[in-house]
Amino acid sequence: MKIHEYQGKEILRNFGVPVPRGIPAFTVQEAVEAAQKLGGPVWVVKAQIHAGGRGKGGGVKVAKTIDDVKRIAGEILGMQLKTHQTGPEGQKVRRLYIEDGADIQKEYYVSAVTDRESQKVAFIASSEGGMDIEEVAHSNPEKIIKVFVDPLVGMTDAQAKEVAAGIGMPADSVAQTVDVLQKLYKCYMETDASLVEINPLNRNSKGEIMALDAKFNFDANALFRHPEIVAYRDLDEEDPAEVEASKFDLAYISLDGNIGCLVNGAGLAMATMDTIKLFGGEPANFLDVGGGATAEKVTEAFKIMLKNPEVKGILVNIFGGIMKCDTIADGVITACKAVNLSVPLVVRMKGTNEDLGKKMLADSGLPIIAADTMAEAATKIVAAVK
């Protein structure tokens, strides 16, 4: 789950990380009132969307008068903000964050992320803040450092100092940087985040350290422990199909292809998409119905896939372990009738009650194309949608 910058800064502030004063706004009038309350003399008007690169896309602008705030807020609110993370369609700006202008002397990058290989928390930092870390990694990889923190020990002073030294933090700011990094680690762990990113972390002319941006991703599996974080969720920023799928406990991610995929198990789902690609097709989605699928869940899965006008065919690939093939067959038959299916459907089933499931499909009278292997299934659905 992602949240907005202003919400992330509220979390950082609660953990003692210095951030500028700011007020969210949902209308131009609220933006003006926020600027008046902050007092100026300089404000930053920031679009709030769940994507990076807002500045380059025209979503972050400096205002030096209240009239500037009013004009800029009017320009940004409601715009389709396009960045390298939104795709060509962009995202509509529905919220703004009006923030005190900052005295920027030097910008740094710092983030905490789970490193599955080392089973530790990786602190990634760079002296090249204020720009995409991907660009830095490509053009100046030597300017990125990584320090791995053992969650059983926590971030030590020595590790925090290693990060500070690695990004060339001046001596008079090292102590505060160590403090900020350790608070950032505490924040990361206690909120069950999967990513916390500050870009930029600013050092002003007085040597003071402050987070000028905040990006959070949270582990969805831990949200039951954090109702205060769930309250930050903004459904307007999420794919409507993915929101609908979550209501039925379906793991769904939209893609750009034209072949809908319904699979049980994340690994098999990814292998299915790879196989479709191998045989010249393009998957329209990732969809894992899980091990407890019912006829209702399968029907809803079909409805969600078919809401995408690009879907020209569907491939169902089931391995019957916990999930019995006859249960899926019943769900597929029910779904086909419920949605009045009009696109080609290929079904491949293996495992528990496989023969019964296949017989149910064959006896249904529906134009279902059967397949025994993944390669055969992929070949048939790719041919059917061309």
Swiss-Prot record:
Family: Belongs to the succinate/malate CoA ligase beta subunit family.
Subunit-structure text: Heterotetramer of two alpha and two beta subunits.
Required cofactor(s): Mg(2+)
InterPro entries in the cross-refs: ATP-grasp, ATP-grasp_succ-CoA_synth-type, ATP_grasp_subdomain_1, Succ-CoA_synthase_bsu_CS, SUCC_ACL_C, Succ_CoA_ligase-like_bsu, Succinyl-CoA_synth-like
Sorted UniProt keywords: ATP-binding, Ligase, Magnesium, Metal-binding, Nucleotide-binding, Tricarboxylic acid cycle
Catalysed reaction equations from the record: succinate + ATP + CoA = succinyl-CoA + ADP + phosphate; GTP + succinate + CoA = succinyl-CoA + GDP + phosphate
A GO molecular-function annotation: succinate-CoA ligase (ADP-forming) activity
Known EC number: 6.2.1.5
Keyword Manganese: no
Function as written in the Swiss-Prot or TrEMBL entry: Succinyl-CoA synthetase functions in the citric acid cycle (TCA), coupling the hydrolysis of succinyl-CoA to the synthesis of either ATP or GTP and thus represents the only step of substrate-level phosphorylation in the TCA. The beta subunit provides nucleotide specificity of the enzyme and binds the substrate succinate, while the binding sites for coenzyme A and phosphate are found in the alpha subunit.
Residues at which ATP binds: 46, 53-55, 99, 102, 107
GO BP: any one term: tricarboxylic acid cycle
Gene that encodes the chain: sucC
Organism domain of life: Bacteria
Protein name, UniProt field: Succinate--CoA ligase [ADP-forming] subunit beta
Residues the entry annotates as binding substrate: 264, 321-323
SUPFAM superfamilies (UniProt xref): Glutathione synthetase ATP-binding domain-like, Succinyl-CoA synthetase domains
Binding site for Mg(2+): 199, 213
Pathway assigned in UniProt: Carbohydrate metabolism; tricarboxylic acid cycle; succinate from succinyl-CoA (ligase route): step 1/1
Residue stretches making up the ATP-grasp domain: 9-244
Cofactor note: Binds 1 Mg(2+) ion per subunit.
NCBIfam families (UniProt xref): PRK00696.1 (NF001913), sucCoAbeta (TIGR01016)
Gene Ontology CC annotations of this record: cytosol; succinate-CoA ligase complex
PANTHER family named in the record: SUCCINATE--COA LIGASE [GDP-FORMING] SUBUNIT BETA, MITOCHONDRIAL (PTHR11815:SF10), SUCCINYL-COA SYNTHETASE BETA CHAIN (PTHR11815)
